[in-house]
Regions:
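Secondary-structure transition/capping motifs at alpha-helix termini
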Residues: 133-135, 163-171, 205-221, 273-281, ...
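Flexible loop/turn segments at secondary-structure boundaries
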Residues: 81-82, 89-92, 118, 148-151, ...
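Alpha-amylase-like alpha-glycosidases and glucanotransferases acting on alpha-linked glucans and related
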Residues: 245-287, 316-344, 398-421
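Catalytic and substrate-binding clefts that recognize carbohydrates or anionic sugar/phosphate headgroups
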Residues: 5-137, 146-147, 152-153, 157-164, ...
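Aromatic-lined carbohydrate-binding/catalytic grooves of carbohydrate-active enzymes
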Residues: 133-292, 331
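Structural recognition of the beta-strand scaffold that forms the well-ordered cores
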Residues: 74-75, 80-83, 140-143, 170-174, ...
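Conserved, mostly hydrophobic/aromatic
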Residues: 20, 73, 162, 213, ...
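Catalytic core of carbohydrate-active enzymes
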Residues: 309, 329-336, 350-354, 358-368, ...
Length: 571
């Protein structure tokens, strides 16, 4: 609801006054002396003045080895002020299609002056921009993904091996080699990075492959690089050309133009929908370029995310995409693909902080290449720690490159690491009832499942001290992101615990909060704390279908205080 406000002119200024702020504006081009906002009579902001910011997120971690600077978020530790410039954002029309950019040069600013009321700021941002949609339940299970030239037999055999080892999976990702990557005439057509025709050398009967994946209870997503359009060798080219009013005999490439509504309609209807009817559940949009639109100013990535997400919802089921972050408001189109990360300890050490801090923009569902993608070397300890983080991150998606030394099957890393990783992946599956309830909490109450601990404890200095500590729903997680000591075989992690008593989930040890503690953990354990009174619903069977309610539950209870938990089951 619009708050009560007073609007008047005085001393050559327009004044807008609410209970909490006083805006003064000279009604000229914005300037530091012409536009200012005073919050609660104390904090004064002038246009163009930078204030401290707790960070938000970035478009991608491509080519980032370790840490990178983050774009601003909505939260500020010192001044409690942030400003979002929304001037160049595409506007959605009443018919659901983006409107042409008007190019008036006008400024469209949103001012947030919440002080340390961090949770309220994020909740109100969701009210302004729409809540995070409800995810399909299956997205919370374990995913398998690898950039590798799989055949149908090899892929299905791998899925069967995971099942034989009682390692649950819910989503199978097929990277770009599902389609033809060697074009019939490279001089004429260019590379096969973009493609839409199944490669029969690897998938001689792709419909049967998809049917077999469904028999195994797996959802399927395929990788797309749409940039190079649809070329004459593609199976659907003649039909698409005719539907777009073009002569297929010319063999001219149909350019990919995300601003062309007619093209986009047929891109879905003619190119993608038939595959969805065959069993593809959603698409991994691997867009890495800036161009791809005939209209200046259109962010092609933003348009792709919007169009794909809306289209995937057309049959009434909960939609899903996997794509890079396209700017503030992208929380409306989950999930986020963070890009091709490096296989290094430095990359792992950055990801917990990076993931949680995105909640400062309401961006709740990052999906990382768990284990990394680029470069690297075979390191059982590194991969085990990465899997542990993945289990306690928004999306648990194992991923790797074609490098045979870095493929992420747990049994490739020795008996100790294999057993630990498989136990964690089973735990992830058992956590689905808990996480699914957190999905609803995010949707209804505006509280992301993964967020910095200072969201809940904004006035306690210790909450800002441990960058890789975060809230995982009601739990406090602090994944190990550094090597263990070669003598003790223990890894040190410093954690801040709020006031109260806490139980370490893996050891059962009880800690008194209100302080920083140094934890030392062997490879099989990571710091995970449940406050006294916490109730954690777990699926009794780790191999239960992640997409349906489990037949039986087990409850983990952290004793020492009364507690309650609202379990959501709606499938």
């Amino acid at each position: 609801d619009t708050p009560e406000f007073e609007c008047y002119h005085e001393a050559d200024r327009l004044h807008i006054v609410t209970k909490h702020l006083h805006l003064r504006y000279d009604e000229k081009a914005f300037s530091a002396i012409g536009l200012e906002v005073v919050v609660n009579g104390t904090l004064d902001w002038q246009y163009g003045v930078r204030v401290d910011n707790l960070g938000g997120t970035v478009r991608t971690l491509d080519r980032v080895n370790g840490a990178t600077d983050l774009n601003p978020g909505l939260l500020s530790r010192t001044f409690g002020i942030s400003v979002v410039d929304d001037s160049d954002t595409i506007v959605i029309g009443e018919d659901g299609w983006p409107l042409p950019l008007c190019g008036t040069g006008r400024k469209d600013l949103y001012f947030f002056g919440y002080g340390r009321a961090f949770e309220r700021c994020i909740r109100d941002f969701y009210k302004l921009s729409a809540p995070v949609p409800l995810l399909p339940r299956y997205a919370l299970g374990n995913w398998w993904s690898r950039y590798h030239k799989y055949t149908d037999v090899e892929y299905l055999g791998l899925m069967d091996k995971f099942k034989e080892k009682r390692v649950p999976l819910s989503v199978g990702v097929v990277d770009m080699d599902w389609h033809i990557t060697e074009t019939p005439d490279r001089e004429r057509y260019g590379s096969g990075w973009t493609g839409y025709t199944w490669n029969k050398a690897y998938f001689p009967d792709y419909k049967q492959f998809l049917a077999e994946m469904k028999k195994r209870g797996l959802k399927v997503t395929l990788n797309l690089h749409p940039r190079d359009g649809i070329r004459a060798y593609e199976a659907m080219y003649p039909t698409l050309a005719e539907r777009l009013g073009r002569d297929p005999e010319t063999g001219r490439k149909i350019e990919f133009d995300v601003a062309d509504r007619r093209f986009m309609e047929e891109y879905f209807n003619t190119v993608l929908h038939p595959y969805e009817a065959d069993g593809v559940d959603f698409w991994w949009i691997d867009w890495q370029q800036r161009s791809g639109s005939s209209v200046a100013g259109y962010d092609t990535l933003w348009m792709l995310n919007h169009c794909h997400y809306v289209d995937n919802a057309r049959d009434g089921h909960r939609p899903l995409t996997l794509s890079r972050y396209a700017g503030i408001g992208s929380h409306r189109y989950p999930l986020g693909f963070s890009g091709d990360t490096y296989v290094t300890w430095e990359s792992l050490d950055f990801q917990p902080y990076f993931t949680a801090t995105a909640a400062n923009l309401g961006y709740a569902w990052w999906s990382h290449d768990i284990g990394g993608h680029m470069g690297g070397y075979h390191d059982s300890e590194l991969h085990t720690r990465w899997v542990q983080f993945g289990v306690f991150s928004p999306i648990s998606r194992l991923h790797s490159s074609p490098n045979p030394f870095n493929s992420k099957e747990p049994w490739n890393y020795g008996d100790e690491a294999e057993g630990i990783m498989e136990d964690y992946l089973r735990l992830r599956s058992r956590l689905v009832p808990y996480m699914y309830s957190m999905v609803y909490r995010n949707y209804e109450d505006g509280i992301p499942m993964v967020r910095p601990i200072y969201h809940a404890y904004p006035n306690t200095p210790g909450t800002f001290d441990c960058k890789n500590e975060y809230l995982f729903g009601t739990l406090i997680a602090a994944p190990v992101t550094t090597k263990r000591d070669p003598q003790t075989l223990l890894a040190k992690t410093t954690v801040w615990l709020p006031g109260g008593n806490y139980v370490d989930y893996f050891t059962g040890r009880i800690y008194t909060g209100g302080r920083l503690i140094d934890t030392y953990r062997p490879l099989a354990e990571m710091p995970l704390f449940a406050k006294a009174g916490t109730i954690l619903p777990l699926a009794a069977d780790a191999m239960a279908d992640a997409d349906t309610n489990p037949a039986a539950l087990e409850l983990y209870v952290a004793g020492g205080a009364d507690g309650a938990f609202t379990l959501v089951e709606d499938n």
